[in-house]
């Protein structure tokens, strides 16, 4: 493919309007733009990303009358996904029709849509455009959804309600247990299985792109390739392949100055993502556990993440006094810069896939406290497969928090985990270099266009 030809070819991206989905999609856009493609991003709302100078070369379209990220918080994931796909199909067709008219009908190489934006398929089929599904989760989570989409809902529900079943390994998904399966994100199990049957149905898509790497998930990727019968391109981690600042929240960079004053590998960084909610009791147990550990910490407390509180007003004055010299709390942090900072020795995370691969990519071991969905899958793999994480299960108490932080930052076991994390980081770096598996996979995808 000659450079001139590629420069005239456009790829359309359709992300879910949520931080964990927008970020990797914009990184994918950067990677494809670096290969010479023009990029159009179709958003359900105008936001900080569309106005960012980092994407000044991108073209942005907005689907009229759609849903926003605030609707996701108000409706919940299940109703949000179903409603989004119901109301966006017709208006998205209009967007694509308008774009084709502007581009003389022959400019669009393909439409890459987030697996949860499956309404996109109807439009690309009508206009006979190639389509590509983009999965923002791990390959293992995709496999899980595929398996769950085929189970008998009634018998599966009986198994999931049996306490004795929870710790058993689910057949064919070792080492995942029943309680690790991504079943809770979309409310009732029946609703979850319905959504999963839509997301794993690649319909007439010509390929699937996964934000992962062969060195992380070779067996799951091979299983997907066999099952889907279309090319699967693991081209991640995209935050390394093509860094693209795309935070929907304002970052407080003062925390970097604070980190500059801390000792190497001494700080535990805590961030539970852009959507997770935590009750006041758990927040207080975390706070006192962090205080009692006597270790420095950088804690992201997102406004509105504690129901009934605007921000940190539920933290006792005594706690604030005790940790004033070694604790730093912000509303949102520049996570990649924090994770690569030499002062950071561990990451307490909800284990969303973006946070997981970002931590792996910087060689930072993790404390895993998943809330829902694929976070539980990732946490299990961090602890049992990659062995660079320790999972906190059950009720949270300050003693458990204190032990986990000390174990990761002070004890010999934590040092061994850090060595394994650095080894995995080196494998990741090799995969994204020229000739590496992820780099080659991206080239293969580009050549297929």
From Swiss-Prot:
Short name of any one Pfam family annotated for the protein: UDPGT
Under Gene Ontology molecular function, one entry of this record is: quercetin 7-O-glucosyltransferase activity
Q: What class of enzyme is it?
A: transferase
Give the CDD domains listed for this entry. GT1_Gtf-like (cd03784)
Record keywords: Glycosyltransferase, Transferase
Identify the EC number(s).
2.4.1.-
The record's listing under InterPro entries reads: UDP_glucos_trans (IPR002213)
Name the positions where UDP-alpha-D-glucose binds: 274, 333-335, 350-358, 372-375
Source domain of life: Eukaryota
Family membership noted in the UniProt record:
Belongs to the UDP-glycosyltransferase family.
The job of this chain, per UniProt, is described as: Possesses low quercetin 3-O-glucosyltransferase and 7-O-glucosyltransferase activities in vitro.
Name the record gives this protein: UDP-glycosyltransferase 76E2
Q: Which organism is it from?
A: Arabidopsis thaliana (Mouse-ear cress)
Q: Which gene encodes it?
A: UGT76E2
């Amino acid at each position: 493919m000659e450079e001139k030809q590629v420069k005239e070819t456009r790829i359309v991206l359709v992300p879910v309007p949520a931080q964990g989905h927008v970020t990797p999609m914009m990184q994918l856009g950067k990677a494809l733009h670096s290969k010479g493609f023009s990029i159009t991003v179709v958003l359900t709302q105008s936001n900080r990303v569309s106005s960012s100078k980092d994407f000044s070369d991108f073209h942005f379209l907005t689907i009229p009358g759609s849903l926003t990220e605030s609707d996701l918080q108000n409706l919940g994931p299940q109703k949000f996904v179903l409603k989004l796909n119901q109301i966006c199909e017709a208006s998205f067709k209009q967007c694509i029709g308008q774009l084709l008219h502007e581009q003389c009908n022959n400019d669009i190489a393909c439409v890459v849509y987030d697996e949860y934006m499956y309404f996109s398929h109807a439009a690309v089929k009508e206009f006979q455009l190639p389509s590509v599904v983009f999965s923002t989760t791990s390959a293992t989570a995709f496999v899980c959804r595929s398996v769950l989409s085929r189970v008998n809902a009634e018998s599966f529900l009986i198994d999931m309600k049996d306490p004795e079943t929870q710790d058993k390994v689910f057949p064919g998904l070792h080492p995942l247990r029943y309680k690790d399966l991504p079943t809770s994100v979309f409310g009732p199990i029946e609703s979850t299985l319905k959504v999963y049957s839509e997301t794993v149905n690649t319909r007439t898509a010509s390929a699937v792109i996964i934000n992962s790497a062969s060195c992380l998930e070779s067996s799951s990727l091979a299983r997907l390739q066999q099952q889907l019968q279309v090319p699967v391109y693991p081209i991640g981690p995209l935050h390394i392949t093509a860094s693209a600042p795309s935070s929907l929240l304002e970052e407080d960079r003062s925390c970097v100055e604070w980190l500059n004053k801390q000792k190497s590998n001494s700080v535990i960084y805590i961030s539970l993502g852009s959507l997770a909610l935590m009750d006041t009791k758990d927040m207080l147990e975390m706070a006192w556990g962090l205080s009692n550990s006597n270790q420095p910490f950088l804690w992201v407390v997102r406004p509105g993440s504690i129901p009934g509180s605007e921000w940190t007003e539920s933290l006792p004055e005594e706690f604030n006094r005790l940790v004033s010299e070694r604790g730093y709390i912000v509303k949102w942090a520049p996570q990649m810069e924090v994770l690569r900072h030499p002062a950071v020795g561990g990451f307490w995370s909800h284990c969303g896939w973006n946070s997981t691969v970002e931590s792996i990519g910087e060689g930072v071991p993790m404390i895993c406290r998943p809330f829902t969905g694929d976070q539980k899958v990732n946490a299990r793999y961090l602890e049992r497969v990659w062995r660079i994480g320790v999972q906190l299960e059950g009720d949270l108490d300050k003693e458990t928090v204190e032990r986990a932080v000390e174990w990761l930052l002070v004890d010999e076991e934590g040092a061994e985990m850090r060595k394994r994390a650095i080894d995995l980081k080196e494998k990741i770096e090799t995969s994204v270099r020229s000739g590496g598996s992820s780099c080659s996979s991206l080239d293969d995808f580009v050549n297929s266009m």
